[in-house]
From Swiss-Prot:
Family according to the record: Belongs to the RapZ-like family.
InterPro entries recorded: P-loop_NTPase, RapZ-like, RapZ-like_N, RapZ_C
Superkingdom of origin organism: Bacteria
Presence of keyword Disulfide bond: no
Residues that hold GTP according to the record: 57-60
Residues that bind ATP: 8-15
Protein name per the record: Nucleotide-binding protein Nmul_A0081
Transmembrane intervals: none
Residues forming coiled coils: none
UniProt-recorded Gene Ontology molecular function terms: ATP binding; GTP binding
Keywords: ATP-binding, GTP-binding, Nucleotide-binding
Upper lineage: Bacteria, Pseudomonadati, Pseudomonadota, Betaproteobacteria, Nitrosomonadales
Its biological purpose: Displays ATPase and GTPase activities.
Length: 279
């Protein structure tokens, strides 16, 4: 039986994620108290459900501290467990709450919205540290739906490498495990014919391939990830997010992510995300 537990900050997209899972055949339970996770999951298994998704977050704050133990209990039952945490930058959450005019679940007469967000972030800290994380700050609803569909299509029990390109001027992705800076390399942006293209286009690829510094940095990053990947696998990680950043996130970082993905796909499960191209 596969169980996906979705957690994260209010406004981060948990409802969208749960809807995608329901549309793909998962039996979904929203706002489940953590202390009921084992009992509900066992009951659903006995009822014939093989794929279940539950949302557990700060709305059930009285029992959140029990979640790590309940996940361990499920693993002892030989269930395939995935904990997914949706993270989002505070300024993005402020904008989303302003647009929807919804109340934060921790709001009261004494706390401002930014204070509620930080309280929730701290409340979920342990879950955040245990989970596979995705930064939804710059993801549209359609991009998040696509990411969730990719996530559930992965082979269970294997570590997945997520290579992500980004632009430093838009901030480092919150879900990064490794971050590499390629801003020191020649920038296709300053070539008039290459500027409107991306790192996926043949002309940009030829430009980058022809530079010895580019190839040397690629080999250094490839070797570093290759050398340390077994350590993350032994640590029972389900996900390893490798983020590659350049200035704008459209040329150099995209080129590196595509090239690294091609190399590692041969022996690993690989996902690719280009944050600025999908924004």
């Amino acid at each position: 039986m596969q169980v996906i537990v979705i957690s994260g900050l209010s406004g981060s997209g948990k409802s969208i994620a749960l809807t995608v899972l329901e549309d793909n055949g998962y039996y979904c339970v929203d706002n489940l108290p953590a202390n009921l996770l084992l009992e509900v999951t066992v009951y659903l298994k006995q009822s014939g459900h093989e794929r279940v998704a539950v949302s557990i977050d700060a709305r059930s704050r009285e029992t959140l501290h029990l979640l790590p133990q309940r996940l361990a209990d499920l693993r002892r039952q030989k269930m395939d467990i995935h904990l997914l945490f949706l993270d989002t930058k505070t300024d993005t959450l402020l904008k989303r709450f302003s647009e929807t005019r919804r109340r934060h679940p921790l709001s009261d007469n004494q706390s401002t919205l930014p204070e509620c967000i930080e309280m929730e972030r701290e409340m979920l800290r342990e879950i955040h540290d245990l989970a596979n994380r995705i930064d939804t700050s710059d993801l549209s609803a359609s991009s998040l739906r696509a990411w969730i569909r990719d996530f559930i299509g992965l082979e269970p029990g294997r570590l997945t490498l997520l290579f992500q390109s980004f632009g430093f001027k838009h901030g480092i992705p919150l879900d990064s495990d490794m971050v590499f800076d390629v801003r020191c390399l020649p920038n296709p942006h300053y070539e008039a014919l290459l500027r409107p293209l991306t790192g996926k286009d043949g002309a940009v690829i030829e430009y980058m391939d022809a530079n010895s510094s580019v190839n040397r940095m690629f080999e250094d990053i490839r070797r570093f990830v290759d050398d340390w990947l077994p350590c993350f696998i032994r640590d029972n990680r389900n996900y390893l997010t490798v983020a590659i950043g350049c200035t704008g996130g459209r040329h150099r970082s995209v080129y590196f992510v595509e090239r690294l993905a091609r190399y590692f796909t041969e022996n690993n499960q690989v996902l690719v995300r280009h944050r600025e191209l999908n924004a």
